[in-house]
């Protein structure tokens, strides 16, 4: 990890010093223990703050559309898929991006760690990711857990741990080994599932954090802000909250890479990934299409053939 971090710092500094990029986007230590925060800088002195650790959870691709000039960006496998999707939609010019690809074995869900050890983060001395296990140190005593119990849910089903689109690869490639994760919601009767979502969206405060953090949400004006016609009331009733999420999922279908940012960023912990993952699976099943895999491919539902299966368009 330290070797990769040193190389990242060296590469990023060189890119800035040689004038090959105007900006560098990566991760720096967060203000809270065992966290990181995005680092966006054009100052080479800031580059020393760049880190690589098991807590680099943010999908940084969202920032590419906000910066002018050539940008170097640290990208895990899922992040690189989001970048490719933005390239496909002409939201990002590939020539203006230097992708510092980061092979990834998964990032740690701190809430899972706290639940397993029954302690808050401030009571934990150290968390180390090593091969297929995580070592947690508390008061000098170590406890080990398999990664399947502590990684973020989207990491467990990751199909691209190593970016396929990159300019510089930081480390050795990691082979994909997605785990089958049960979907308890799909096993529920339809009525119970409906009641579940009614309860969940009754808690939604309509803060739009899910929209703001999503790389696939890039409309200049969102439908929820329209007043003629007005699609949703500004007061967060559960019916309008549900409509917002259904419409948002339809809008990003074929662009969602299952990065899990929408669910992670939700302040009231609504399991939004259950919705996006369902749409992701349907696109794969019906159209054999996965977002962000090929920058040369046409965006989803923008290319048609005479031989197109008729049962899908009736």
Regions found by a protein language model. Name each.
Residues 1-197:
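Iron-sulfur-associated redox domains of electron-transfer enzymes in respiratory
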Residues 9-10, 198, 208, 250:
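Residue-level marker for well-ordered alpha-helical positions
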Residues 15, 19-22, 90, 207, ...:
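Short secondary-structure junctions and interdomain/linker hinges
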Residues 78, 104, 152-158, 204-210, ...:
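Disulfide-bonded cysteines in secreted/extracellular proteins and peptides
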Residues 81, 212, 273:
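Glycine-centered loop/turn positions within well-structured domains
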Residues 87-90, 204, 282:
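Alpha-helix boundary/capping residues
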Residues 145-148, 212, 246:
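Homeobox/homeodomain signature
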Residues 175-202, 216-314:
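Ferredoxin-type iron-sulfur electron-transfer modules in oxidoreductases and energy-metabolism complexes
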């Amino acid at each position: 990890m330290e070797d990769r971090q040193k190389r990242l710092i060296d590469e990023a500094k060189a890119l800035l010093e040689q004038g090959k990029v105007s900006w560098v986007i990566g991760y720096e230590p967060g203000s809270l223990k065992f966290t990181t925060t995005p680092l966006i800088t054009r100052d080479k002195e800031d580059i020393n703050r760049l880190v690589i650790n098991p807590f680099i959870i943010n999908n940084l691709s969202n920032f590419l559309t906000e910066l002018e000039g050539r940008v170097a960006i640290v990208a895990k496998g899922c992040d690189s898929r989001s970048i490719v999707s933005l390239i496909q939609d002409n939201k990002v010019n590939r020539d203006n991006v230097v992708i510092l690809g980061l092979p990834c074995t998964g990032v740690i869900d701190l809430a899972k760690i706290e639940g397993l050890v029954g302690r808050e983060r401030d009571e934990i001395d150290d968390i180390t990711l090593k091969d297929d296990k995580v070592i947690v140190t508390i008061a000098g005593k170590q406890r080990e857990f398999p990664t399947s119990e502590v990684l973020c849910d989207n990491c467990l089903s990751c199909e691209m741990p190593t970016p396929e689109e990159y300019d510089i690869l930081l480390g050795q490639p990691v082979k994909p080994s997605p785990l089958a994760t049960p979907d308890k919601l799909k096993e529920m009767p339809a009525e119970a599932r409906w009641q579940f979502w009614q309860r969940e969206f009754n808690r939604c405060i309509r803060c739009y954090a899910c929209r703001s953090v999503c790389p696939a949400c890039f409309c200049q004006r969102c439908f929820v802000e329209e007043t003629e016609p007005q699609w949703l009331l500004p007061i967060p009733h559960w019916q309008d909250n549900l409509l917002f999420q259904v419409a948002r999922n339809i809008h990003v279908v074929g662009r969602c890479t299952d990065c899990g940012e929408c669910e992670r960023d939700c302040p009231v912990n609504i399991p939004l990934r259950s919705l996006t993952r369902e749409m992701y699976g349907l696109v794969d099943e019906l159209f054999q299409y996965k977002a962000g895999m090929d920058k040369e491919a046409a965006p989803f539902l923008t290319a048609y053939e005479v031989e197109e299966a008729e049962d899908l368009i009736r």
